[in-house]
Design a protein with these regions (language model features):
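Membrane-interface interhelical connector segments
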Residues: 292-320
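Juxtamembrane transmembrane-helix boundary signature
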Residues: 64, 95-121, 291-298
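Hydrophobic alpha-helical segments and their helix-loop junctions in multi-pass secondary transporters
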Residues: 143, 180, 201-230, 292-294, ...
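Hydrophobic, membrane-embedded alpha-helices of multi-pass small-molecule transporters
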Residues: 52-74, 143-146, 212-218, 225-282, ...
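Membrane-interface "cap" regions at the ends of multi-pass membrane proteins
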Residues: 28, 41-75, 236-243, 262-268, ...
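Transmembrane-helix boundary/entry motifs in multi-pass membrane transporters
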Residues: 46-56, 84-90, 114-145, 163-169, ...
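Extracellular loop-to-transmembrane helix junctions
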Residues: 51-55, 81-109, 277-286, 393-404
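Membrane-interface loop-to-helix entry segments
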Residues: 152-161, 168-175, 183-214, 388-407
Length: 459
């Protein structure tokens, strides 16, 4: 079982601009399912004849999709910052990023489920073994990235207020920060209940805008061909870097995914679920890039048009009702992101000795929330584009070194080695493993008998 409620906060409050809170209800199902599974077995990956239903594979994959396609994605700023400037290579780089992300999540879930690990701390200790203390590198990345996400949510909401009502951006930051603080203290439960519908609405409206925008402009093929004719393969190095960087900062959702992925009790199930997620994520991201490429000449020429390019394009198409629906949903979604993420921060940090001197719990929570929001507001002064370009970007560089590369090299090796030594952890019986091995290598009579209890080993 997961060790404590605190561990769940640390895994779940990553539902930032990268994760709309409407995934919370689905995640709760996985938590209950996975914990029940762990109670009945020595390890989640044990001998089993039950076929994992497709709906479960799809649902776990959809959690990663919802983590990616949140309010930050819906603004269009992330796609503009990392892919539109690459021209025809933008969609290629985006597909590569989603492949890296899903492969990393697959290895992480496989490592957790095969060994019965109970936290991302144990996961990274296993990954980095014998250098166990390096697990703190992910902790550093995680908290910095989530703080950036809160700042991006405040900045995005303030930018939306500026676009719709002409409100001064800095006044908007103060107003949004105050609203987030009040909701965190008094209305977090209400926000969590409403966020399900807000998240669904923003995703549907954003995809609708992307589809209509591509058809409305009608010049996508011409834009791609023109860019290829002028740039050729000159942007390949930058495309590769952006591919890894984007996948890197999206790894902030890893704690949520290993929690939701506990029902995936075989290696094949982990793989299938992540391939489903890869298709969903790649299609959505490429669709947004295609739309922005089609309209790049327009929204880059508008003052402030690159901050929320999706809104800029929507206005130009003259679809007033869609513009209003999109704006309301985006604003509420970003606010809920700020509230739920701040609430998770409060639950984690109010236990520190620094704040224990405040005996009255509500006052202690309010002080911690105020500190976090003031810090996030300070960061948001840099503007949404700078937060995504530099804040997310440097976190992405860091994650390449501490998450992506380790999981896709050492992680792959350790998982394969562990599954060879513990065939039951792959969802096969020992007898089935022996037969498979004998069929592949007839000269060998048997396999080493695996331990009856799947101990948490370093490799």
């Amino acid at each position: 079982l997961w060790k404590s409620e605190e561990e769940w906060y640390r895994g779940s409050f990553a539902l930032s601009s990268l994760l709309p809170p409407w995934a919370e209800e689905r995640k709760s199902f996985f938590v209950a399912w996975g914990n029940h599974h762990l109670k009945e077995a020595v390890s989640p990956m044990k001998k089993t004849s039950a076929k994992i239903p497709f709906v479960l594979l799809f649902s776990v994959g959809a959690v990663l999709f919802s983590a990616h396609a949140g309010g930050g994605f819906a603004t269009g700023n992330q796609a503009h910052t990392y892919y539109v400037g690459l021209g025809w290579l933008g969609p290629v780089s985006a597909v590569g990023a989603m492949l890296l992300l899903t492969l990393t999540m697959r290895e992480a879930m496989l490592m957790v489920n095969s060994r019965g690990l109970t936290s991302y701390k144990e996961l990274f200790k296993t990954l980095y073994h014998p250098f166990d203390k390096l697990w703190v590198l992910f902790e550093i990345f995680f908290y910095i990235m989530v703080l950036m996400a809160v700042a991006a949510a405040i900045s995005g909401a303030a930018s939306a207020l500026t676009e719709y009502f002409g409100l001064n951006y800095y006044v908007g930051i103060g107003l949004v920060g105050l609203v987030v603080l009040c909701l965190t203290i008094f209305g977090a439960d209400l926000v969590r209940m409403a966020s399900t519908y807000m998240g669904i609405a923003i995703l549907v409206t954003a995809v609708a805008i992307y589809g209509v925008g591509i058809a409305w402009r009608g010049n996508l093929q011409e834009v791609l061909w023109q860019d290829f004719a002028t740039q050729g393969f000159g942007n390949v190095p930058q495309a590769i870097l952006n591919c890894f960087t984007y996948a890197g900062f999206q790894c902030v959702t890893l704690p949520t995914m290993i929690a939701c992925g506990t029902p995936l009790t075989t290696k094949k199930a982990c793989s299938r679920s992540m391939w489903i997620s890869f298709v969903m994520n790649a299609v959505a991201l490429v669709l947004s890039i295609f739309m922005l490429l089609s309209w790049q000449g327009f929204y880059t020429s508008v003052d402030g048009g690159t901050v929320i390019p999706t809104l800029t394009v929507c206005r130009e198409m003259g679809m007033g009702w869609l513009t209003v629906v999109y704006g309301v949903c985006l604003l509420l979604c970003l606010l809920s992101t700020g509230v739920t993420t701040t609430f998770g921060f409060v639950a984690r940090f109010e236990k520190l000795p620094l704040f224990r001197k405040i005996s009255y719990a509500p006052a202690r929570s309010a002080v911690v929330a105020a500190f976090i929001i003031v810090l996030s507001m300070t960061i948001s002064l840099a503007g949404l584009s700078n937060i995504i370009k530099y804040g997310y970007g440097y976190c992405g560089y860091f994650a390449i070194a501490v998450v992506i590369v380790p999981f896709l090299t050492v992680g792959v090796y350790k998982n394969r080695k562990y599954l060879r030594a513990h065939p039951q952890a792959e969802g096969r019986s020992y007898e089935e493993a022996v037969k498979a091995c004998q069929a592949a290598e007839p000269e060998e009579d048997t396999l080493p008998v695996p331990a009856g209890n799947f101990e948490k080993e370093g490799c």
